[in-house]
């Protein structure tokens, strides 16, 4: 019996049980789950997730990218991978979770990827019990310091649930008004979903990508933070800003990371600084 089959046969049916399970896992296993979400597509979310994984792995952390963009997954494409199995196979009980995970090397950094699958509307049939069970299985593997969940753009139920169940939400946006409006909705629903799960705190951090200058990025953050304070009663943390860099598209076309192709570029420096500020504990997954 696969590890996913074992937990899918015991779905979580109540909010109180979800809370109990998450709290017990948090105390026993030290893996940091970081959800990377955005309100709209095209803001660089997946590129950022891969770059962040590469930087954290270079720091010595054991990292897994979970491609949670059900239906439009493309982490494997950006990395040039050709996975034999993926998340849909795990959800369909055709393969064990560990057998679907694939190793990846970018430059001198090594990390793992749990690939998704494009063109399959799998999210419609996934309930919270299956999602919680999947996170449980990943935590119980106890081999990762960080799991980065590259989520679907928007506010579908699966994306919202995975965001709320994570330890940190990195909400990615650009300076464009439409992107800011949409990421505000993501943060608003994230806070609401955390309350629904019985959590008393939120750890929402904003990533502003493709900024013209650090000054314009700071002004964008200040306006959005003020809106959150006025209407939500809390303000997000500024995780960091990434300057617009023409070398990013070139790295994506090469199916590589800009931290490998041009490590001294504006975007590389900004991603590295942002990753360093996350303060991920060393060997967190072995600290229990």
Give names to the regions the model predicted.
Residues 45:
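Conserved lysine of the Walker
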Residues 151-240:
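Conserved catalytic-core segment of NTP-binding enzymes
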Residues 48:
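Hydrophobic positions on the alpha1 helix immediately C-terminal to the Walker A/P-loop
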Residues 229-258, 271:
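Beta-strand-loop-alpha "switch" segments that mediate conformational coupling across diverse proteins
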Residues 70-72, 118-121, 154, 176-178, ...:
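Conserved nucleotide-binding/hydrolysis micro-motifs of P-loop NTPases
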Residues 253-288:
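NTP-binding/hydrolysis catalytic cores, primarily Walker-type P-loop NTPases
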Residues 65-145, 252-253:
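P-loop/Walker-type NTP enzyme "switch/lid" segment
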Residues 1-42, 54-55, 61, 99:
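Extreme N-terminal, non-catalytic leader segments
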């Amino acid at each position: 019996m696969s590890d996913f089959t074992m937990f899918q046969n015991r779905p979580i049916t109540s909010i109180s049980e979800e809370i109990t399970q998450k709290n017990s896992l948090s105390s026993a296993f030290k893996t940091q789950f970081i959800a990377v979400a955005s309100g709209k597509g095209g803001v660089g979310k997946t590129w950022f997730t891969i770059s962040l994984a590469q930087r954290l792995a270079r720091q010595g952390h054991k990292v897994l990218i979970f491609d949670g963009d059900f239906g439009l997954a493309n982490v494997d494409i950006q990395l040039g991978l050709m996975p034999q199995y993926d998340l849909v196979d795990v959800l369909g009980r055709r393969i064990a979770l560990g057998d679907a995970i694939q190793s990846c090397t970018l430059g001198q950094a090594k990390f793992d990827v749990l690939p998704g699958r494009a063109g399959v509307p799998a999210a419609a049939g996934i309930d919270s019990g299956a999602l919680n069970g999947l996170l449980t299985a990943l935590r119980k593997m106890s081999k990762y310091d960080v799991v980065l969940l590259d989520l679907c753009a928007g506010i579908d139920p699966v994306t919202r649930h995975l965001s709320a169940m994570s330890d940190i939400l990195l909400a990615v946006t650009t300076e464009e008004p439409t992107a800011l409006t949409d990421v505000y909705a993501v943060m608003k629903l994230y806070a609401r979903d955390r309350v629904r799960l019985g959590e008393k705190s939120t750890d929402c951090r904003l990533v502003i990508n493709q900024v013209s200058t650090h000054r314009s990025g700071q002004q964008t953050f200040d306006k959005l933070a003020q809106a959150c304070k006025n209407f939500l009663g809390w303000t997000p943390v500024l995780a960091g800003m990434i300057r617009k860099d023409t070398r990013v598209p070139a790295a994506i076309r090469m199916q590589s990371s800009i931290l490998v192709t041009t490590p001294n570029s504006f975007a590389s420096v900004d991603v590295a600084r942002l990753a360093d500020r996350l303060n991920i504990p060393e060997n967190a997954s072995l600290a229990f």
